[in-house]
């Protein structure tokens, strides 16, 4: 799906990977670009707008842990531009000692934003179809002992995204669901692996993991922008060490419908 003339929302667009992706997306000649974030960085919003005057950039102060904040922010988008064509869910933290906050931001908030946004995009309701890109992690595909809680949240994102990305839903709504899985990327979140781990015993392997090869946020952001345009329902992509690759998950069981 080309983004020219489209209305796009990026939740968590002022983080490191998110902001780099936002800069890439500004080259796509979107009609409107809504950046939702708890961070307030007016200079970054101005910098985005300066990249392409053809795209109107909006900033919304956003609390992903609040259903009311989610509902109000999405309603404001519809009031301004009528249609939502792409929704990117990119808010995330890595702080295993705080289980509730990790789950509320990484998983529950993403679920609530998706469930609130998808009906607004549904071609059978008030939308015209589109794409939702949920940002999971390579740690949503494989376990990582020093970040067990973070892993659990991202495994949840993966299961949720694959479920609502079923062709059954896509054929009805016209809304594709794609999952994007960054590998280790040079951001403060990556650095938290070495300090905000699951157990005291995790320190050694956390530090070892934190010292392995990474990629720049600019590279990961460019990959994310590419995935947003793919519009491939059910697609799962890994961005790791500078390479973007499609993933085909192993299927152990499939539901049978009668």
UniProtKB/Swiss-Prot annotation:
The keyword Signal does not apply. It catalyses: a primary alcohol + NAD(+) = an aldehyde + NADH + H(+); a secondary alcohol + NAD(+) = a ketone + NADH + H(+). One of its GO terms (cellular component) is cytoplasm. Coiled coil: none annotated. CDD domains: ADH_SDR_c_like. NAD(+) binds at residues 9-33. GO terms for molecular function: alcohol dehydrogenase (NAD+) activity. This is Alcohol dehydrogenase 2.
